[in-house]
């Protein structure tokens, strides 16, 4: 018989730096799982990507065991790194924040493809381009 799922918790945590302090502790403490076990395992698996934010989806079962799935970093985070900026523009219509090339856009779309609701790479590029536009990042040919 399959285990019964009691909760699904979604978090965005810095790679290799998860600690039982907020936001991890309060989110997982209510589910009754071993927070330190999750933190150690997460930090081990994401140690190669230190400096990026890695979303994680934790499935908690009735016997207090858990499994988790690591997702790709948020598109905004990837775009900021590619454009070499700290944050997006506060006034996207009038003020630009930076720019990326079409090749960089394609590379970001390929990276995000598993987590996007897109059937092909062109659709994924349009999704990432929309995020870039809302951040004030221009796409150069």
Curated annotation (Swiss-Prot):
One or more lysine residues are methylated. GO terms for molecular function: large ribosomal subunit rRNA binding; structural constituent of ribosome. Keywords: Methylation, Ribonucleoprotein, Ribosomal protein, RNA-binding, rRNA-binding. It comes from the Bacteria. NCBIfam families: L11_bact. Belongs to the universal ribosomal protein uL11 family. This is Large ribosomal subunit protein uL11. The lineage of its organism: Bacteria, Bacillati, Chloroflexota, Chloroflexia, Herpetosiphonales. The gene is rplK.
